[in-house]
Design a protein with these regions (language model features):
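Viral virion structural and adsorption modules
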Residues: 1-162
Length: 162
C-alpha cells in the first residue's frame, strides 16, 4: 500500500492516508507529483489541506515514515519529527538531539541483568539547571520494584543520586 501525507500551508502533516500501489505505478511512479495529483483526485483534501506528498512506510525515501505534526522540508525532500522539547536541536541528519547526551549507562552491567535504568527527559529540570535534564530510576528486569527507589540525574557520564 502507498501512503500519502496531507500537508497544510506550513508543510505540517495533517493526516496520513492509504493509496493503491497500482495507481502510483500508472501515474508517474513513486514520489512523483503526478501520483500525488492523481491521489488528490481520488481522495479530496480536507479544508486545511493544500497538497499530498508520498511517505514511505519502510523508510525507503524522505528520511522516515511521516506522522501527524511532522514537518515536510521540501528543500531537503524529507519528513522531520516534531521537536520533542524546546531545548532540543536538529543535528546534521535532521534528528532531534538533547542538549545533554543520551545516557550511555543503561543497566547494572551484570550478566544476566538484574536491573535497568528507566529514564526520561525533564524539560523543566533542564530549564532550571542546564547541567541536568535526564531523570532516572532503577527498574528490576523481572518487573519487581527495585529496593533503591531514589531518583537520579544523568550528568553526561554517570547517574548521580539527587
Amino acid at each position: 500500500m502507498a501512503h500519502f501525507t496531507e500537508l497544510d500551508s506550513n508543510n505540517i502533516v495533517l493526516a496520513v492516508k492509504l493509496g493503491c500501489n497500482i495507481d502510483i505505478q500508472n501515474n508517474g511512479g513513486e514520489q512523483s507529483e503526478q501520483a500525488a495529483t492523481h491521489f488528490e483526485s481520488v481522495v479530496p483534501l480536507s479544508e486545511q489541506g493544500v497538497k499530498y506528498v508520498q511517505t514511505s512506510y519502510n523508510h525507503n525515501f524522505r528520511k522516515q515514515y511521516a506522522g501527524i505534526n511532522f514537518f515536510y522540508d521540501s528543500t531537503k525532500d524529507k519528513f522531520i519529527c516534531p521537536q520533542p522539547h524546546p531545548s532540543w536541536s536538529l543535528d546534521s541528519n535532521d534528528d532531534w538531539q538533547p542538549p545533554i547526551t543520551y545516557p550511555t549507562i543503561i543497566d547494572d552491567g551484570a550478566d544476566p541483568r538484574i536491573w535497568i535504568w528507566s529514564y526520561n527527559w525533564n524539560e523543566d529540570v533542564y530549564q532550571s539547571d542546564n547541567t541536568k535534564g535526564w531523570k532516572g530510576k532503577k527498574l528490576n528486569t523481572d518487573r519487581r520494584v527495585h529496593t533503591d527507589t531514589a531518583t537520579y540525574d544523568w550528568n553526561g557520564t554517570a547517574w548521580v543520586a539527587e
